[in-house]
């Protein structure tokens, strides 16, 4: 799937002002991918601790809302993708199918079953923290939307979102150290999406804890070792995902100075590894294809960083160029025909295009 060209300069200007670079054709493509994925039960990689033989069950029985898309977190964020496209581009051809899918999957009964599963003693660390973050992101997306259907889905999802928010409140005080890997367990990513949820859904206690933990873990970081990136299975840049968190946490007047200490080489485009898209040698390999996701997540991080800097800050222009280069590279891998990437990369593409 290529980035494609926008229909006119005027349209591009409007989209850039609103933060939405997603074209109608791209919206249709990723919507079709997500619609197919959320209904595809197999293959499936369960994160399922069994206390006995009675816990043996297929994905649809365990997770009636989020049984598809290969794994639970990918299914959750595919629903976020569908909700976001419907909110931003209500006239997308697949709109009726999207509404029907969200109505069916996000029923009160389905969500109640997900809550019951989440509260099992054996599920204490189920999908911590990547799946938790995406569930809160879905809740935040629905919660900010005035659409009548979306308001109903938001109410239905609220018990699960509240359970996840409660799990954050239980976990974070015990978490002495951050997790800085460029994969699912990254705590900067977990805090970023929890912060978004707390702000849009009035979860004051969670928001305060997230801010406190982000400052404890990341405020003093200097001269990030980004020259060591990427690792071979990264789909996040540990460096940029941290900066994407801190631009949320810090006052707008604080962030530019923090960024100068954290990444002092931006104006020199150093380290080069952070400005050069990753090479993806084999899109049929489930770990190597993570690097397509890395390019897309770097794109949304660089774009968000640029937006958090003053307009006359030279680093904003450099960050925007880096975002454009990574987005172009990452979009090549979306809809490749390889399910190891197709079950999740569309979501990263939508974030890169609409952040």
Language-model region placement:
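Extended ligand-binding groove/face enriched in aromatic
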Residues: 76, 85-198
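Well-ordered alpha-helical scaffold segments within catalytic/enzyme domains
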Residues: 16-22, 79-92, 133-149, 190-202, ...
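Solvent-exposed loop and edge beta-strand segments that line ligand/cofactor-binding
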Residues: 19-24, 60-76, 116-132, 174-187, ...
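Long, repeat-rich segments with strong aromatic
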Residues: 201-338
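HEAT/HEAT-like alpha-solenoid repeats
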Residues: 32-35, 39, 43, 64-68, ...
């Amino acid at each position: 799937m290529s980035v494609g060209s926008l229909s006119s300069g005027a349209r591009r200007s409007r989209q850039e002002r609103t933060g939405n670079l997603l074209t109608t054709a791209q919206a249709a493509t990723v919507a079709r991918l997500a619609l197919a994925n959320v209904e595809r039960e197999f293959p499936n990689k369960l994160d399922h601790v069994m206390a006995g033989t009675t816990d043996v069950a297929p994905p649809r029985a365990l997770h009636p809302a989020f049984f598809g898309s290969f794994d639970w977190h990918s299914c959750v964020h595919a629903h976020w993708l569908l909700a976001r496209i419907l909110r931003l581009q209500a006239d997308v051809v697949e709109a009726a199918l999207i509404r029907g899918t969200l109505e069916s999957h996000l029923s009160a009964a389905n969500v109640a079953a997900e809550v019951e599963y989440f509260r099992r003693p054996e599920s204490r660390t189920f999908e911590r923290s990547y799946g938790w973050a995406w569930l809160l992101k879905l809740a935040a997306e629905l919660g900010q939307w005035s659409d009548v259907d979306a308001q109903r889905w938001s109410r239905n999802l609220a018990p699960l979102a509240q359970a996840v928010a409660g799990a954050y409140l239980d976990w974070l005080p015990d978490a002495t150290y951050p997790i800085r890997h460029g994969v699912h367990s990254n705590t900067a990513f977990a805090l970023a999406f929890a912060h978004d949820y707390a702000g849009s859904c009035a979860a004051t206690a969670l928001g305060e804890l997230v801010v406190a933990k982000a400052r404890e873990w990341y405020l003093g970081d200097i001269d990030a070792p980004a020259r060591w990136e990427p690792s071979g299975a990264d789909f996040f840049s540990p460096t940029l995902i941290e900066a994407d968190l801190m631009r949320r946490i810090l006052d707008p007047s604080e962030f530019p100075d923090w960024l100068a200490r954290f990444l002092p080489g931006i104006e020199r485009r150093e380290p080069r590894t952070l400005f050069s898209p990753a090479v993806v040698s084999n899109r049929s390999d489930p770990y190597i294809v993570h690097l397509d996701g890395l390019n897309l997540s770097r794109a949304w991080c660089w774009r968000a960083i640029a937006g958090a800097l003053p307009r006359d800050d030279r680093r904003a222009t450099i960050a925007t160029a880096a975002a454009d280069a990574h987005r172009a590279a990452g979009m090549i891998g979306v809809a490749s025909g390889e399910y190891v990437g197709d079950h999740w990369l569309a979501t990263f593409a939508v974030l890169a295009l609409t952040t």
